[in-house]
Amino acid sequence: MPTSHGERSCTRYKLKKTVRERGLSPISKAIQDFEEGQMVHIDIDPSVQKGMPNAKFQGKTGKVLGKRGRAYLLQVTDGNSKKEVISLSQHLKPQKY
């Protein structure tokens, strides 16, 4: 059988929650706000499919450039190039200094 090339292919362990994290995520993750220029970590929540960035950006850190509706526009470094990623707040964590 040929290999699939879907959006969630090769994410068997990347998009898996631990036993304690199973179920819906808290509402506080959905209503968190980020300022423009703030640094955030991409931490994909597999229980929320909308606004999910590509799995290759899991664990990356980026800078908030602005908003696109309810989602945030991020600038992430991928190798030597800078990429723009659109993601909902459920998939983001603020960076602690």
UniProtKB/Swiss-Prot annotation:
GO terms for cellular component: ribonucleoprotein complex; ribosome. InterPro entries: Ribosomal_eL21 (IPR001147), Ribosomal_eL21_arc (IPR022856), Ribosomal_eL21_CS (IPR018259), Ribosomal_eL21_sf (IPR036948), Translation_prot_SH3-like_sf (IPR008991). Keywords: Ribonucleoprotein, Ribosomal protein. GO terms for molecular function: structural constituent of ribosome. It holds the Pfam family Ribosomal_L21e. The keyword Ribosomal protein applies. GO terms for biological process: translation. NCBIfam families: PRK04306.1. Belongs to the eukaryotic ribosomal protein eL21 family. This is Large ribosomal subunit protein eL21.
